Amino acid sequence: MLTPVNLLDFDVDGLVTWFAERGEKPFRARQVMRWMHRFGETDFGNMTDVAKSLRAKLAEEACIRAPRAIRDAVSVDGTRKWLLDVGSANAVEAVFIPETNRGTLCISSQAGCALDCAFCSTGKQGFNRNLSAAEIIGQLWLANRLLGGSASPAGSKDGDGGPDHASRATKLDHRAADAKGVQSDSWRSSDPEEDHNGRVISNVVMMGMGEPLANFDNVVTALRLMLDDHAYGLSRRRVTVSTSGIVPAMDRLRDECPVALAVSLHAPDDALRDRLVPINRKYPLRELMAACQRYLERAPRDFVTFEYVMLDDVNDSDAHARALVELVRDVPCKFNLIPFNPFPNSGFDRSPAERIRRFAAILIDAGIVTTTRKTRGDDVNAACGQLAGQVQDRSRRTVRLVKPMEGR
């Protein structure tokens, strides 16, 4: 018996092609795509506006399968983290961050990461494999279901019948975080007046485990689904890819699927960045800054976001801040300063709060929009740099850095 094809692996063009190979018209592919992504449906039998003969054929040849959540942890600030089984003893993590006017989902692109950035928990596990498109978009698909964010077929503009899978009783109460005065500026849209139209998940950031641009094809397939009106219909401005700086892939992303861009910078000069972000040895800062300028020619935003983790007595001096001002002088940008989030045996400490404030002030005085990320979810190891999952390392070793989490 043939292994069923997972339809979550296809963007709309891929699904249209797959349907055409079976003698089906393009509109049938779009119908099924709406059921999968808008409504979170997995049972072809429930797709009531799809011909019964096609439903039967799909039940034989296809499936809709997202990663399975094997752990679910909720922080005191409302942040929610899932450990997701992706097979072969590998697990990745996704994080939902609720805020007053938006909900941001941080998703992973690889099981582990080969780039081995010095301050990142994921990199210390080594690398196993790229996630499939289904495993990437499946994180958004699953989070929508678990958070009650899937639309109701009965209430859709297409008039599709069927059960209401959008159980609003499961929607996470964003007010829990608000009551504590929690903020997370660097996850925010730069358009605070924008409304997210009642979506539970209004923004997606590719800032989880792995280097997204090292898994280019599968990530772009997932991005296209996020943007597609037949699937999630997110604005390009509300989808962000974060990269450590793989320059050729940045150029490809600009040409094929330009979304908001964040760059993990973390140092103002090549000597220091070579130590902290080893990919810099291949694509040094001069090439990276030029790639950022090229990206802005087609980007949905008129700036690049530079992420900068604040490491005590490593990259946080006034001189480092002034060097950054010079480095980015010709690149329209904003900075997110990220207080380092500790993990076992990292060898780094977080910069003191006063030093972070002074560092930010130098950037702001130079006219650079600068925010300091409010740490979210660190009590469940969901904060930036703490995502670890479980990875069977094919490059060096097998290390598990997951701490036990309370199940919901």
Curated annotation (Swiss-Prot):
Residues 99-379 form the Radical SAM core domain. Its cofactor is [4Fe-4S] cluster. Its main location: cytoplasm. S-adenosyl-L-methionine binds at residues 210-211, 242, 264-266, 341. Its EC number is 2.1.1.192. Reaction proceeds by a ping-pong mechanism involving intermediate methylation of a conserved cysteine residue. This is Dual-specificity RNA methyltransferase RlmN.
